[in-house]
């Protein structure tokens, strides 16, 4: 049943289907040790990552997104031509123009859907889910495809051990629509940004400030640069606050959470945030060791794996959290 707010009817939003895709090629820590000055022990201790997936030559972001989307559509029992809207969270689109979303729309044959990209880095899927929620709640759309897809292996400097060990390629997708009943669905989403911290994680070249040039390429300004220590400090401060904000908005306690699905950037960050909240690690679905940091794909992939493993039961309270470059971050609560 829809919720009533004054004279306005609001519909509960639910995730009707999930899907994921990761390329076949596996790059292990031992493989990286042959490329840069690192070791399996060094990477594992600092990040929790054991391996990551790398896209094949000729494979692009939209290719991965389409496979994940088809899995999600199949689970939801939804045809691509019935989609009203496609939201794609990515910082590694096939090309600067047009959006990755319209390319995916064409590949899926989703002719009715309007499509656009969201650029919120690792928090992108959560931003996309929040946008989709507003359209479903107000009755503007009934079937929305939210995708997080990243091909980061082409954006890292493979001589920089501080970044090349972290990232992987993958895609995750969610089909969003009206909840089956009034007791289930998204309870709330909470988004934040702080542009004063933009410099701690960025790709400085390739935009209007530093257009693509021989100098940009020579200085590797087209690659990811980051200050890992500052990112850690920022994340462990704001993510617990975001989860508490969501709980407070719904009159709930930390102990009410059945599962927590985080963006997985670094095991230390996730473990520290859970520790500060008093949430046992057993309530968290972790796959960072197998995929690395897949940015916007991370959250929907984790949700899909937990869903397909039958870990999520009707009525379970699921907390989601993500943080990315910008800085951008947020949280969501959902009654599965």
Label every PLM stretch briefly:
Residues 222, 235-240, 254-277:
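Active-site pocket-lining segment
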Residues 15-17, 43, 72, 86, ...:
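Buried hydrophobic positions in well-ordered alpha/beta secondary-structure cores of metabolic enzymes
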Residues 137-171:
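Flexible, glycine-rich active-site loops centered on histidine and acidic residues
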Residues 68-84, 241-258, 306-311:
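Phosphate/pyrophosphate-binding loops at sites that engage ATP/ADP/AMP, CoA/4′-phosphopantetheine
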């Amino acid at each position: 049943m829809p919720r009533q707010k004054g004279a306005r009817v609001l519909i509960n939003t639910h995730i009707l289907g999930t899907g994921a895709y990761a390329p076949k090629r596996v790059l292990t820590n031992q493989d990286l040790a042959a490329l840069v000055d690192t070791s399996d022990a060094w990477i594992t201790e600092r990040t929790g990552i054991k391996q990551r997936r790398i896209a094949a030559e000729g494979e692009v972001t939209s290719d991965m997104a389409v496979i994940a989307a088809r899995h999600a559509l199949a689970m939801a029992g939804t045809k691509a031509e019935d989609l009203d809207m496609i939201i794609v969270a990515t910082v590694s689109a096939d090309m600067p123009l047009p959006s990755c979303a319209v390319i995916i729309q064409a590949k899926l044959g989703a002719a009715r859907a309007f499509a656009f990209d969201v650029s919120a880095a690792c928090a992108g899927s959560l931003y996309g889910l929040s946008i989709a929620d507003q359209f479903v709640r107000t009755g503007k759309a009934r079937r929305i495809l939210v995708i997080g897809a990243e091909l980061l292996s082409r954006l890292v400097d493979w001589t920089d051990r501080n970044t090349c060990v972290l990232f992987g390629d993958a895609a995750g997708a969610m089909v969003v629509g009206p909840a089956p009943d009034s007791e289930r669905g998204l309870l709330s989403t909470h988004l934040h940004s702080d542009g004063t911290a933009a410099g701690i994680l960025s790709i400085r070249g390739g935009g209007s400030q530093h257009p693509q040039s021989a100098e940009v390429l020579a200085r590797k300004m087209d690659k990811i640069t980051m200050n890992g220590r500052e990112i850690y400090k920022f994340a462990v401060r704001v993510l617990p606050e975001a989860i508490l904000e969501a709980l407070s908005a719904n009159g709930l306690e930390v102990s009410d959470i059945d599962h927590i699905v985080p963006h997985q950037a670094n095991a230390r960050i996730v473990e520290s945030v859970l520790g500060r909240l008093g949430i046992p690690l057993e309530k968290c679905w972790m796959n960072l060791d197998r995929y690395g940091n897949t940015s916007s794909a991370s959250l929907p992939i984790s949700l899909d794996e937990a869903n397909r493993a039958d870990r999520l039961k009707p009525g379970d309270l699921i907390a989601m959290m993500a943080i990315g470059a910008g800085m951008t971050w947020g949280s969501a609560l959902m009654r599965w």
